[in-house]
Amino acid sequence: MFAGALLLAAGLSSLGFAQKPGLKFNPDKKFKIVQFTDLHVKWQDPRSDIAFERMNQVLDDEKPDLVIFTGDIIYSKPALENMRNVLKTVSDRKIPFSIVFGNHDNEQGATKEELLKVAESLPYSLTADEVPEISGVGNYALTVRSSDGKKDACVLYCIDSNTYSTIKGVKGYDYIKRDQIDWYCKKSAEFTRNNGGEPVPSLAFFHIALPEFNQAASDENAQLYGIRREKACAPALNSGLFTAIKENGDVMGVFVGHDHDDDYAVCWYDVLLAYGRFTGGPTEYIHIPNGARVIELNEGARTFKTWIRTKAGVEQLLPIRIHS
């Protein structure tokens, strides 16, 4: 049986299917994630050199267990080659990675479905389309096993925040749809049930901020850490994901991109709402040094640390404790 499993894995690899690495807390009960966002890479454009430089520097400095790209990865044709080239920066280092889409990725001559296949095909990719029948492309949940490998110790929800509003009379960006929220709630309930009725500590990653980011940032009682140079370009309509998060009691933090001049984090009803740091170069607007957000999870606790890593070093080190 074991030999057969090895042959099957080898056969799949030879057909071009990437093996899916497992995620697990380290023996020190830590697990580190690097979030790259808004690379806006233009094919063979020198202005994107600094994006690759920063990714490599952050990976050298942080040595993460997982990298998550939160959208707007590519910004020119040829789309498939461009996407593959960006993701190989991580894949070639044998670091597990996953992606969610931004509102610009499918504007470069390829569909999200085509781009997803590129991401899925690379070694060390955990990118998936777990539920193709619901809205968006690339909604999936990643599990991080406990250091002893006996249970799911953390869940990472990767969600497509879609692109632009399709409702007549409603301008601006789209929202996470009801069927996507229903999927998250179903998965959350399943993980909670399998964990003896206790919600599994979780994080959520997508591109476009929730409306609650603006609410939290403008609340005089909320402590905001980091840079806020622009209002969150959130959907005009609130579809209720944050309410579902509070009802389920599992997600400790929501991590987004999209707004290049923001990298702040603010706790809102005991959920950290946080931007990544813009990782790209001057192919798009940017008024702060590029970098990345880092998240370090603690096994068996609703606590984590997060900080920004730039060329200059570490900024905004925040120890976060979420009250159940």
Predicted region positions:
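Extended active-site neighborhood of metal-dependent phosphoesterases/phosphodiesterases
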Residues: R84-G197, R293-N298
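Active-site-proximal beta-strand elements of phosphoester/diester hydrolases
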Residues: K30-W43, A153-T163, F205, L272-F278
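N-terminal active-site segment of His-dependent metallophosphoesterases
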Residues: F17-T89
